[in-house]
From Swiss-Prot:
Subcellular location: Cytoplasm
Active site: K188 (proton acceptor)
Family according to the record: Belongs to the NAD-dependent glycerol-3-phosphate dehydrogenase family.
PROSITE patterns recorded: NAD_G3PDH
Taxonomic source organism: Desulfitobacterium hafniense (strain Y51)
Protein's UniProt name: Glycerol-3-phosphate dehydrogenase [NAD(P)+]
The protein's Enzyme Commission number: 1.1.1.94
Function: Catalyzes the reduction of the glycolytic intermediate dihydroxyacetone phosphate (DHAP) to sn-glycerol 3-phosphate (G3P), the key precursor for phospholipid synthesis.
GO molecular function: glycerol-3-phosphate dehydrogenase [NAD(P)+] activity; NAD binding
Gene Ontology biological process: carbohydrate metabolic process; glycerol-3-phosphate biosynthetic process; glycerol-3-phosphate catabolic process; glycerophospholipid metabolic process; phospholipid biosynthetic process
Spans through the membrane: none
Recorded metabolic or biological pathway in which this protein acts: Membrane lipid metabolism; glycerophospholipid metabolism
């Protein structure tokens, strides 16, 4: 059994620690607030973020980052905007060659870089693996069957992570397409916000199905333009994650979208949700990327207008419905062309 450290004691970090601990691994769950970690150790439960889930004896909550020195694998479970800063803080503790698994689903604001690119810059002596897929912490913590995907340019590292994470209730696939896996996990949060808008406005299943279907089409367009394999967006990190995030009561992005659709201001919504809503930041980045790559992303554009330009969600839905006539098969043809380009030339790994 392996020695594993999870840095970030929120709901997802705790759920992964519990899953790996039940598999027999020795897991250090590292948080920044010493008093909270001491309380978690006493209670054997993370009441603020994952109430009702008992920590197995193999999971040790701690505020001491020094335990990272012993880790064979580090699972980084912090918000996307904290990834670079966190990597800078902890890199002195890591042994050379320690595998680093990123679980955040977002992009770096300003640079537009994927988080594996950020980690490669800050931790150049460590294999970087990304984990994504339809996986709410509340369900993983309760041992409900869950399937995810890990991706890396280092196939041996990806397979090592697969072996360490796999349990009878937590199935892990591998995928060499790091770009597609990261972008699918990040961009689906935008569509989840929009699905929430629709629910908040009182619209029905037809509307949500349209948003999800057309949403995955525009995610795939931009993802392929950025070097991802279009097939990845039809898998766990794309359609799979999109479905669960757009339909689940556990989804922060969907809950935030519902509140916005009901007319609440963004600042109030973010305060009420209480945890990071990745889709808000990602909407701005995706909007800027769509303009950079000259890719049509009408749903993302309307989400941007609602979040950052004060547009009314109902008007945004009307704008989408009143767009010029299109032929759906053109979308399929474009994706097929991009897929052929990917297979012929391989992914643009941007130096990874």
């Amino acid at each position: 059994m392996a020695k594993i450290a999870v840095y970030g004691a929120g709901s997802w970090g705790t759920a992964l620690a519990v899953s790996m601990g039940k598999a027999g691994h020795e897991v250090a769950l590292v948080g920044r607030n010493l008093s909270e970690m001491d309380l978690m150790e006493q209670r054997r439960e993370n009441r603020p973020y994952l109430p009702g889930v008992v920590l197995p004896p193999t999971v040790r909550p701690t505020g001491d980052a020094g335990v990272l020195e012993e880790a064979e694998m580090l699972v980084l479970s912090v918000p996307s905007h904290s990834v670079r800063e966190t990597a800078q803080k902890i890199r002195a503790y890591l042994q050379p060659g320690t595998i680093v698994v990123n679980t955040a689903k977002g992009l770096e604001e300003g640079s537009h870089k994927r988080l594996s690119q950020v980690l490669t810059e800050e931790l150049p002596h460590h294999p970087i693996v990304v984990l994504s897929g339809p996986s709410h912490a509340e369900e993983v913590g309760k041992d409900m069957p869950t399937t995810v995907v890990v991706a890396s340019q280092n196939s041996q590292a990806a397979e090592a992570v697969q072996d360490m994470l796999m349990t009878p209730k937590f199935r892990v696939y591998t995928n060499p397409d790091t770009i597609g896996v990261e972008l699918g996990g990040a961009f689906k949060n935008i569509i989840a916000l929009c699905a929430g808008f629709a629910d908040g406005l009182g619209f029905g299943d037809n509307t949500k199905a349209a948003l999800m279907t057309r949403g995955i089409a525009e995610i795939t367009r931009l993802g392929a333009a950025m070097g991802g394999n279009p097939l990845t967006f039809a898998g766990l990190a794309g359609v799979g994650d999109l479905i669960v995030t757009c339909t689940s009561r556990h989804s922060r992005n969907h809950r935030a979208g519902v509140a916005l659709g009901e007319g609440k201001p963004l600042e109030q919504v973010l305060k009420e949700v209480g945890m990071v809503v990745e889709g808000v930041r990602t909407t701005r980045v995706a909007y800027e990327l769509s303009r950079q790559y000259e890719i049509s992303m009408p749903i993302t554009e309307q989400a941007y207008q609602v979040l950052f330009q004060g547009a009314d969600p109902r008007a945004a839905v009307s704008a989408l419905m009143m767009r010029g006539k299109k032929h759906e098969i053109e979308e399929v043809a474009l994706i097929a062309m991009e897929q052929g380009s990917y297979q012929e030339n391989g992914p643009d790994d941007h130096g990874e």
